[in-house]
């Protein structure tokens, strides 16, 4: 991606992901969304199987696979559709924003580089000190290089 568009893209993605942040804070039901929604709506596994045009045991297998994090997106989408739901998913940064994620990665890379150089210089009795300032400067350089101001 061209550097001049990277900052704009980060802002756009952060705006798109904002509603998902609140959803990410709510845990999945212990037995999964499929089972929770099916039971709450009073829909039998047989009804789901009929809509999916499959065996009666498959909906229960899908519910178990979802609860165990083994279900595919394709299967989850089909099961959601059979329940009259849409599958909505997103990758949500663990921090507040995607930009913070990028900055943290750049800072970690800069710190590794600066500490490596500082260590080499210390071995040669030329240590400069001020590691924090060097890390911050290197972080800013890396972000500028990626087109992020």
Positions of predicted regions on the chain:
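Helix-turn-helix/winged-helix DNA-binding modules
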Residues: 29, 40, 68-71
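N-terminal flexible/basic segments that precede or flank functional cores
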Residues: 1-29, 97-149
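Short C-terminal boundary/hinge segments that cap the last helix of small helical domains
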Residues: 84-100
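DNA major-groove recognition helix of helix-turn-helix/homeodomain DNA-binding modules
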Residues: 73-89
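Short basic helix-loop element that most often maps to the first helix and adjoining turn
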Residues: 2-3, 32-51
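Recognition helix of helix-turn-helix/homeodomain-like DNA-binding domains
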Residues: 52-70
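Short, contiguous strand/loop micro-motifs
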Residues: 20-22, 32, 62-66
């Amino acid at each position: 991606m061209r550097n001049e568009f990277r900052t704009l893209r980060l802002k756009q993605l952060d705006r798109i992901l904002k509603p998902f942040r609140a959803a990410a804070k709510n845990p999945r039901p212990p037995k999964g969304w499929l089972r929770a929604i099916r039971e709450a709506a009073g829909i039998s596994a047989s009804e789901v199987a009929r809509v999916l045009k499959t065996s009666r045991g498959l909906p229960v297998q899908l519910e178990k696979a979802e609860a165990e994090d083994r279900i595919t997106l394709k299967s989850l989408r089909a099961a959601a559709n059979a329940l009259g739901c849409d599958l909505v998913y997103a990758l949500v940064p663990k921090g507040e924003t995607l930009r913070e994620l990028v900055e943290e990665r750049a800072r970690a890379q800069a710190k590794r580089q600066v500490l490596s150089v500082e260590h080499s210089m210390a071995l040669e009795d030329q240590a400069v000190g001020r590691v924090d300032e060097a890390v911050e400067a290197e972080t800013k350089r890396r972000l500028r290089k990626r087109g992020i101001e």
